[in-house]
Amino acid sequence: MINHITDNQFKLVSKYQPSGDQPQAIEQLVDNIEGGEKAQILMGATGTGKTYTMSQVISKVNKPTLVIAHNKTLAGQLYGEFKEFFPENAVEYFVSYYDYYQPEAYVPSSDTYIEKDSSVNDEIDKLRHSATSALLERNDVIVVASVSCIYGLGSPKEYADSVVSLRPGLEISRDKLLNDLVDIQFERNDIDFQRGRFRVRGDVVEIFPASRDEHAFRVEFFGDEIDRIREVEALTGQVLGEVDHLAIFPATHFVTNDDHMEVAIAKIQAELEEQLAVFEKEGKLLEAQRLKQRTEYDIEMLREMGYTNGVENYSRHMDGRSEGEPPYTLLDFFPDDFLIMIDESHMTIGQIKGMYNGDRSRKEMLVNYGFRLPSALDNRPLRREEFESHVHQIVYVSATPGDYENEQTETVIEQIIRPTGLLDPEVEVRPTMGQIDDLLGEINARVEKNERTFITTLTKKMAEDLTDYFKEMGIKVKYMHSDIKTLERTEIIRDLRLGVFDVLVGINLLREGIDVPEVSLVAILDADKEGFLRNERGLIQTIGRAARNSEGHVIMYADTVTQSMQRAIDETARRRKIQMAYNEEHGIVPQTIKKEIRDLIAVTKAVAKEEDKEVDITSLNKQERKELVKKLEKQMQEAVEVLDFELAAQIRDMMLEVKALD
């Protein structure tokens, strides 16, 4: 782990003061951390300000903090909130940078090799580099991460040792700087200037760090000495100011110096010889030939370029690790005494525990059939016990802590009172007969009051059918499914809050951390279908989605009341009783949360254009909308005639959205 010398302080900026039972929760958590307690649970009901409590704790204990969330949507939301609370500190975002990812795999039954295929999101890659560089430069850092943080990342020591440090007056030739940049995987491109690239114009070298997306640095030489360094606008070249020191971090997290690379290549060759001998002994000549060809190509690429596709599969040799030794991860970039907070821990812990086995079974197949060396098995996520070995102090945060958390600690700090005085919603059970028409009436009542609705179903088909039906009924509705890209998810939540649409339908995406105060109705279909999505914890989480609005109401559609339903209803009633008593004692009238609607993370231009298109539609008058519907109908017919039914369906959905505005 990395240790720092700097001693920056966290500075919490908020117009709020702790209220309700937040002050006691903050005090207990801080006292326990300062007293050396390793693990504790913050059991906070939905909407009680758990994120604010977490921020207060981080500010008071002043430790670098890793906040782990179980999905990218929740991580994006937390990132936005922490950035607002800590504008002067480094708040970073670290999730998987793949918009699409098909891992390398082999299916022996059909003799099918599936090559790794992926689409990397440039914005998220930039944020990942920003996170690791911040951890090496300062100690006032909060990293909000998904479970990606337990996957192999490359050695933090190699990463830190590879930093190119520049300052005015430094004696270094221009060519030496260019070589140093190439060594840390920067690419020279004098025409297309992007992140992770540099360009040269005479005695001027312009460098675009991997952790930036708008600003680059211009290094001006006088002979073999740096004359000055300027920060510039990458697009226009406008000078923003001069800098006294510039640290250029590697353009990739998997970086190795020349000496270590030679040692690594020797080890890869030795392992290749061993594995070829094993295959030949077993009569697996095809596998031996395949492995020899692939590995020798990779070795040649590593020797000539210092990099190859799938370089992470050789990370054990490049890091100098022993067989079976855990890989370096984001956790190794933190100092020894850092703090971990696991948000929605009842979900996140399950993911941390399950990642290793799925990865292992896929890679074993690749090794057995000669697609990878056995050392590829050590490019993997951490096991649960390996993750635990990184834990110095940890806070599990959840409205419904799981069995694992309760086994780790008996220290449970409850936070039930909401600062706004909001109560847990009233829950009622209605029969399934006529449920859709009943629900339609409830939605229309909310639309009239400019309130939003969440609907959770059990199957993808039901969610799609329900969405189509409500569109036909003139409801502005969207379906949030698992195929939606990372940054689009946060945009959907934002659009719901802005009123671009009124109803959001989903399966398992609505339960934890989707923070929409405008939602006053949560409808749970098939509430009596006992299982993962309808157990006690799941139902309590779903009920909590309506707890941020003073008109919050939950309808469970079911023909019988299961034990899980009853326990969830009873727990909600218990909390509601405590909250009502507190409000009565302090003369508090419940008020819906007023929360600023903001862009959580900068989105791509394509998404921005799409958003502009939606804004234009809403600004059209009735006659213009009528003409637009006619045009869309014509386009839909043309798409059907050329058998492009997918396009036709998209146009149909757009048409229904326009009609819903009337």
From Swiss-Prot:
One of its GO terms (molecular function) is excinuclease ABC activity. The lineage of its organism: Bacteria, Bacillati, Bacillota, Bacilli, Lactobacillales. Residues 435-601 form the Helicase C-terminal domain. It is found in: Cytoplasm. One of its GO terms (biological process) is nucleotide-excision repair. InterPro entries: Helicase/UvrB_N, Helicase_ATP-bd, Helicase_C-like, P-loop_NTPase, UVR_dom, UVR_dom_sf, UvrB, UvrB_inter. The beta-hairpin motif is involved in DNA binding. The keyword DNA damage applies. Pfam families: Helicase_C, ResIII, UVR, UvrB, UvrB_inter. Belongs to the UvrB family. Gene3D superfamilies: P-loop containing nucleotide triphosphate hydrolases, UVR domain. Signal peptide: none annotated. Keywords: ATP-binding, Cytoplasm, DNA damage, DNA excision, DNA repair, Excision nuclease, Helicase, Hydrolase, Nucleotide-binding, SOS response. This is UvrABC system protein B. It comes from the Bacteria. It comes from Streptococcus pneumoniae (strain Hungary19A-6). GO terms for cellular component: cytoplasm; excinuclease repair complex. The UvrABC repair system catalyzes the recognition and processing of DNA lesions. A damage recognition complex composed of 2 UvrA and 2 UvrB subunits scans DNA for abnormalities. Upon binding of the UvrA(2)B(2) complex to a putative damaged site, the DNA wraps around one UvrB monomer. DNA wrap is dependent on ATP binding by UvrB and probably causes local melting of the DNA helix, facilitating insertion of UvrB beta-hairpin between the DNA strands. Then UvrB probes one DNA strand for the presence of a lesion. PROSITE patterns: HELICASE_ATP_BIND_1, HELICASE_CTER, UVR. ATP binds at residues 44-51. Residues 626-661 form the UVR domain. A motif (Beta-hairpin) lies at residues 97-120. SUPFAM superfamilies: C-terminal UvrC-binding domain of UvrB (SSF46600), P-loop containing nucleoside triphosphate hydrolases (SSF52540).
